[in-house]
């Protein structure tokens, strides 16, 4: 009885409280509850805003934590989770209404309340993040799913929730969205960041976001790949939000109008540009498994506006709308099982093939109607705004007080699933929440406020986008470049070029040819630094000992970064690009490649320079560049620079002191030095002091040195087991640098790097041999030296990422040996370990030649992607095999040239030659060898394999690898990249390029036979090796009968046979396929003309 009385008392108290609130509804702190009453047409501005204020108070701010300021993911049931992304949109909703209230002079304190609700949330997130500063430090050095910031926190305490095993916390989109809204809100006048500790922490968040282009994450939907199996992917939406955040925060002062130089954020422009390139390469796809995704809407439209390519924007948006739009909202992505009736809520991950169950019954999310409304307002498209407002109205619900509720999703109940699958769109869907039970989807509620305020013109796009993330096409000519991703419509940039000679005697020599240069001494007090010194300076950026943050990671500075002028500790500093840096990788010592790199760098700068002021490009000329045959190409390049145009880029060559006035100056004020701080030591580029009375000579004193010095007179296999004293004696006696390098490599493995030789330690001796060989262009010795000292190019990781975002896989490892398949971007250290582990066991030089190939292919695939058409997996070891095979063909009866003796520029040209698709003058054996080594496939090949698999219940076998029909067809779709990669993986066990090409031809034959004979189907596993063997046997029978050639196991003559024609390979393959098909049952067909009774 007492319990019943207590319950009655509680109910009575709630009734009384509700009546009391109704009586004092005029208070500015308690919104009216009569929102469902009709609104008059002649509403005042106050009335309009009061309408939305009541909604915000009751559907958003009511749930904000009074301690942390965060917003819960679930509004009832005592759930303590707060997700960063949801809280950010809630803060944005309150901030948007605060911006509207700024138009009213006497707002009764509402502007202050709403602004500080947003500030409280933003600072609450910052508080949660800063408590995980150790994770930021780890993630900077090693970005992995187990070192990232958490994305879910306790709503009241800010404690981290859920372990890395329980939840996919790696959601870079959430961190990027925080940075973006931080900039937008501070730009509108809010004070969110209070001290330099917080500034240094935000700077470290920027360091984490800069490398998003190579960090696969779990994405907006927290599930990673479409299969929801715990694997991460590179997502366009994450990369796009990161790109937008970096553009917005670059050069931004976190203290707002009251800021100083210490509160400015720095962004690596080259890292940002890699994010831009990655995004443009990935789109219109969301990821490898997601053909499209609704998560792209906030990426390409509000709030990120990450695209500056209108064509790509339209293509991406059209794909999202066409494939995902429904009556109740947008599907997140196809075969999304989230909250469907068939999803098992007790399991975190799906089983293989489970996503097939969700085909056609995916939940629809009304929130994306709101995104489309906002997009329509920004783009000045009232028709789009009205279209989606009309779609939104019938799916909205209302609370008991009449407040609008945006359901999180609409689902198909279990009883109607089969009807919906049989007749898509026929069944009524039901909302996940309607507000009457206290359940609200706060992300949707916040976006509703923003969309309605914009649609009702209570705020303008410029109000909620003060940093101009979106700029209309007509205004792009005069846009401020600092905060926008759009540049001028016409990019007619002139690049400033300063020519710097290594020495005074080189300057005098070039002057005789009319080339005016300056030496490092002549540009003083301006200092010239290599980019490593600038990296050393940036190491001081963001350091905070209290938080345990070390500052900017040791990452190279790219061409955009070295095109600015820097003020460092009172000095004016300019930097030469990394392509002139001899310490990076030996390829810069090849003059022809250096000239190509200079042209490419200038074209790159012209295309992607987005700042006021002109870029400054330093061309560093070394004495070594003009020796012998290298002089004329360098002179031609310098003459082109002097004329003012090179490689299609306009340039202006002048003295450095003159060019500085029009350049961009970056003040590195974070290098402030107090009495207690130690001054960093920086080394500028020093002028070469030649011996007295010496002159620069055009011709090398030993023109035949490359021919004489290349071929070593020692063999590793012979010398590796000889005693150390014999090796040392031979080392002292031989003058061949390649032989010296080989002998030193044996000593390095046996005795270690600190073993003493005649010229010091082994490691120092190898380094000297490497330098000498580079100066003499003895490429065999250079590659030996680079391999033994494990040289690694800083550009390998970005180039591998380029492969991946162009939809390719890459394998590292020697031909005929174990290979490492790279499907996701990796850090430079991991790639270096893979290269030297996989390649050194076969041939020491393989590790460095593979790096050359990666660099060359990265450049080619960016500029001429059509050369890689039909090549899904780039197998570096196999491409090297194809190049060596090509050299054998060219050599004919003579010994083939050694690939390792060619210069890097000759290697690049050889690569371009074999990539050319037209090989009409070649015999079929050679063509199949090259195409097989390149893993080249005909157009539509993977789609045809899918069609074969549909008619092959037991799957396909080749080289012992089985491609099953199930769960392949259930898990994947025909046009999904993962299916194509699975086919490539199946073919990966084939060890002969020409045989692989025959198998590709066989699959095309099987596809055509099945297409023309719909009544036929394979009954058992299709063993492709068996079919090739049968075809070869038939070929041998014909050869024996017609040409009286004895049967043999060697298939060379078969490989050299044209595919088409009376006795082409396809005729034999077709016969083998038909024999296998006719062994099975034939499906009866009443329309068959052969059926006569």
From Swiss-Prot:
* PTM sites of type Phosphoserine: 12, 27, 701
| Gene Ontology CC terms, in alphabetical order | cytosol; phosphorylase kinase complex; plasma membrane
- N-acetylalanine found at: 2
Q: In which pathway does it act?
A: Glycan biosynthesis; glycogen metabolism
| Location in or out of the cell | Cell membrane
Membrane topology value:
Lipid-anchor
Modification after translation (UniProt)? Ser-701 is probably phosphorylated by PKA. Although the final Cys may be farnesylated, the terminal tripeptide is probably not removed, and the C-terminus is not methylated.
The UniProt keyword set, sorted, is: Acetylation, Calmodulin-binding, Carbohydrate metabolism, Cell membrane, Disease variant, Glycogen metabolism, Glycogen storage disease, Lipoprotein, Membrane, Phosphoprotein, Prenylation
Q: Which residue(s) hold a covalent lipid per the annotation (S-farnesyl cysteine)?
A: 1090
Q: Name one GO molecular function term.
A: calmodulin binding
Instruction: Tell me which Pfam families the record gives.
Output: Glyco_hydro_15, KPBB_C
Q: How does it assemble?
A: Hexadecamer of 4 heterotetramers, each composed of alpha, beta, gamma, and delta subunits. Alpha (PHKA1 or PHKA2) and beta (PHKB) are regulatory subunits, gamma (PHKG1 or PHKG2) is the catalytic subunit, and delta is calmodulin.
Which pathological condition is tied to this protein?
Glycogen storage disease 9B: A metabolic disorder characterized by hepatomegaly, only slightly elevated transaminases and plasma lipids, clinical improvement with increasing age, and remarkably no clinical muscle involvement. Biochemical observations suggest that this mild phenotype is caused by an incomplete holoenzyme that lacks the beta subunit, but that may possess residual activity.
Q: What does this protein do?
A: Phosphorylase b kinase catalyzes the phosphorylation of serine in certain substrates, including troponin I. The beta chain acts as a regulatory unit and modulates the activity of the holoenzyme in response to phosphorylation.
Q: Which family is it part of?
A: Belongs to the phosphorylase b kinase regulatory chain family.
* Name of the molecule in the record: Phosphorylase b kinase regulatory subunit beta
Q: Which organism is it from?
A: Homo sapiens
